[in-house]
Design a protein with these regions (language model features):
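Alpha/propeptide regions of enzymes that mature by internal proteolysis
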Residues: 1-240
């Protein structure tokens, strides 16, 4: 995780954009087999390795991909959707579109699933203009079928960014999706009902069932970053 932070910090210090920083940090996490994203994604119950990723910016752009095969860095494909007419692509269609844009196609070996371990990755970056970019990537929750869609590529569930605030979630995707967790935490802050920290605590404690593991990170255009979880979720913030 330190290497990913250093990569994003270097981009931002050099005057790069929030999108560039978030994507490149996410790529480093996808390339690390420790995490359930990209090269470290877990097998589905049929033995396949299917990858989801999303990217949203505070200026209203969005891209997400679902169930991609043979794509070690799905976040790069999501990033290429930011300026397209369409927002999201899935399955074979997503891979075909990635081929047309020159994205590398390579088998992802993946790894066996692990009980009780999530390891989805998320990055939120802010550049010198105050613009935000929120990137997430996953191989999906362990022991799920090939057709299953979790929270990561679903707007408002695994991520939400607009009006100077970005929120990203990780954990049990079904619970996150049912509660529309990222959007509702985001809305609670914007409505001035809570701070970043208290809104995340509210979201997990009030919207998520007891015993379900979930974590959140958030960042505003004019403040520090924050993280909160009801389980062991490593997170870090760099303030340049």
């Amino acid at each position: 995780m330190e290497a990913a932070i250093a990569r994003a910090a270097g981009i931002l210090e050099a005057g790069g954009t929030a999108v560039e920083a978030a994507v490149e940090a996410c790529v480093m996490l996808e390339d690390d087999p420790v995490f359930n994203a990209g090269t470290g994604a877990v097998y589905r119950t049929d033995g396949s390795v299917l990858l989801d990723a999303s990217l949203q910016t505070s200026d209203g752009r969005m891209g997400f991909v679902i169930a991609m095969r043979d794509t070690p860095n799905p976040i790069r494909v999501a990033a290429d959707l930011l300026d397209e007419e369409i927002n999201g692509l899935a399955g074979n269609g997503a891979r075909a579109w990635a081929d047309s844009k020159g994205h590398p196609k390579a088998a992802v070996d993946g790894r066996p699933p692990r009980v009780g371990v999530g390891d989805t990755v998320g990055v939120i970056a802010r550049d010198f203009t105050g613009a935000l970019a929120c990137a997430t990537s996953t191989g999906g929750t362990s022991y799920r079928p090939a057709g299953r869609v979790g929270d990561v590529p679903l707007p408002g569930s695994g991520f939400w960014a607009e009006h100077g605030l970005a929120v990203a979630a990780t954990g049990a995707g079904e619970a996150i999706t049912r509660s529309l967790l990222s959007y509702r935490v985001h809305d609670r802050v914007l409505s001035k009902e809570a701070t970043l920290e208290s809104a995340m605590q509210w979201g997990i404690n009030e919207l998520i069932e007891d015993g379900v593991s979930v974590g959140l990170i958030s960042l505003a255009s004019d403040g520090g970053g924050a993280g909160y979880s009801n389980t062991d979720m490593p997170w870090a913030a760099w303030m340049g």
